[in-house]
């Protein structure tokens, strides 16, 4: 399993770095109660935080928005998209409650304020990544590394690259875009925004690489996310979790497992 950051990334973003968690031989088919509980708890916390501190005023979110602007890329950071998705679910639940379609809750309770809606489950590994995005407000990407024959590379988009959106439709790429690539297949475009179908984690995924992109202002939090993911993955999947940290001085990771 290999991940490399092209030196050109550091030319424009010298303070860029990434936390990694690699794991091989996971069973991603079976639901995990601990991960389900984590996703629900993270959803509850994120729902409360949305009431107290909107995304627009969150310093960490602004760091990623500023990086997109600096790179000339339009997009919504992955964690912001996930938080917005949760907000939509909460709003839908509140509308249903007003219409009398759900049981009423006490006005002084937490669920009375935001409901008890959690993000829909996808599969254990994806649920873990999305829960971490909600809890820490940082982007967390999970990549299916397949048979490990292809390295994951963070680089500029090139002619011949192919990106399929979540619906499987091919979308054109801009030449200035920063992408996560497995060969010519683009898994994430616009740096840390849009996840596609290529390289996406599915229930049958066995070998996985989690990547937490960050900058100087969010580095300490990203380290906490990496350590939290490694611990939870080890507990839930029962496999060895390999962690690493990449920056301009160490821009390549090769698994030793």
Question: Residue locations for each model-derived region?
Answer:
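Charge-biased, low-complexity intrinsically disordered regions
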Residues: 1-257
